[in-house]
């Protein structure tokens, strides 16, 4: 059992494992909570015939999305299909128009404080 340090390293190692054994490689993602409020996520790629087990553990919630993308990509590899390229986001250009300068409006009435004279 090997714990890998980064998500990218886990992806490359599990991808090569899935390419070598596409029918028998399994991927699991578990979320654990402890009483001491230590929450963590474990991703595991396991191939039973050879006994190869790759693990990645993190306590960062932002990496959950990355791990789900990895699971999606590995499903393509296990079925023998190519991983589709990520769609590029289209940037729609809008013409720049000049904005009119805002004319200062009259100050609201009653907002001035009355001046008081000196007390004797």
Swiss-Prot record:
Region: Disordered, residue numbers: 79-120
Biased segments, Basic residues type: 110-120
GO molecular function terms noted in the UniProt entry: 7S RNA binding
GO cellular component: cytosol; nucleolus; nucleus; signal recognition particle, endoplasmic reticulum targeting
A GO BP annotation: SRP-dependent cotranslational protein targeting to membrane
Domain of life: Eukaryota
Gene3D superfamilies: Signal recognition particle alu RNA binding heterodimer, srp9/1 (3.30.720.10)
Name used for this protein in its record: Uncharacterized protein C17H9.07
Organism: Schizosaccharomyces pombe (strain 972 / ATCC 24843) (Fission yeast)
